[in-house]
């Protein structure tokens, strides 16, 4: 199955750590599902708001909130790895959802910030935008954990988020290598990410 192949490129897909979908499991584990759904939500928001060229650094409030969202996945992951507690599906999907929703902002800042330019356009105009994005991402993860009929939609969304995230890293690399050349960086990056993940997924299955 295509979605399973794409998920295999980046995720262990352990059945006991994944949500059920149909007769099997979702293409990504609970934590990765949260991460990549959050990533897709954030990228969709930034695209709709025409912020893909934004490069102004975060406000203090946005920077603090963004940093705080990284803590849950680190604490839960390390705590369960070292045996301090046993993580569960809710903790996995929520910690993934929170960090996934803030990663695209970091990527945009890394790609677009230019100390020689004014960097006038903000990634988030108000901290409220970031808060709402986080609530929506976490809400979808919580709904999935509750058993709401979201598995099919979020399975597709998570794989799209996977392509967007790795496409973002390719985009960052291309922008650094090519400088100010006017090229369709985003389209090239998404195509490269898709092909790379598809090939790796096939090798990992």
Show the residue positions of the predicted features.
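Secretory/periplasmic and organellar redox-cofactor proteins
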Residues: 1-18, 24-25, 33-42, 46-205
């Amino acid at each position: 199955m295509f979605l399973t192949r794409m998920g295999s490129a980046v995720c262990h897909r352990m059945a006991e750590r994944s949500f059920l979908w149909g007769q099997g499991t979702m293409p990504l584990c609970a934590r990765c599902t949260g991460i990549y759904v959050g990533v897709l939500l954030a990228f969709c928001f930034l695209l709709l708001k025409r912020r893909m060229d934004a490069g102004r650094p975060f406000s203090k409030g946005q920077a603090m909130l963004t940093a705080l969202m990284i803590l849950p996945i680190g604490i839960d992951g390390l705590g369960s790895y070292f045996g301090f507690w046993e993580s569960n599906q809710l903790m996995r999907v929520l910690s993934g959802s929170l960090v996934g929703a803030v990663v695209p902002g970091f990527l945009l800042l890394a790609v677009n910030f230019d100390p020689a330019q004014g960097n006038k356009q903000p990634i988030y105009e108000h901290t409220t935008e970031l808060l709402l994005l986080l609530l929506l991402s976490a809400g979808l993860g919580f709904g999935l954990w509750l058993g709401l009929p979201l598995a099919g939609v979020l399975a597709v969304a998570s794989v799209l988020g996977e392509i967007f995230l790795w496409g973002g890293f390719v985009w960052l690399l291309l922008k650094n290598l090519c400088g100010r050349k006017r090229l369709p960086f985003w389209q090239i990056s998404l195509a490269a990410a898709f092909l790379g993940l598809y090939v790796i997924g096939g090798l990992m299955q």
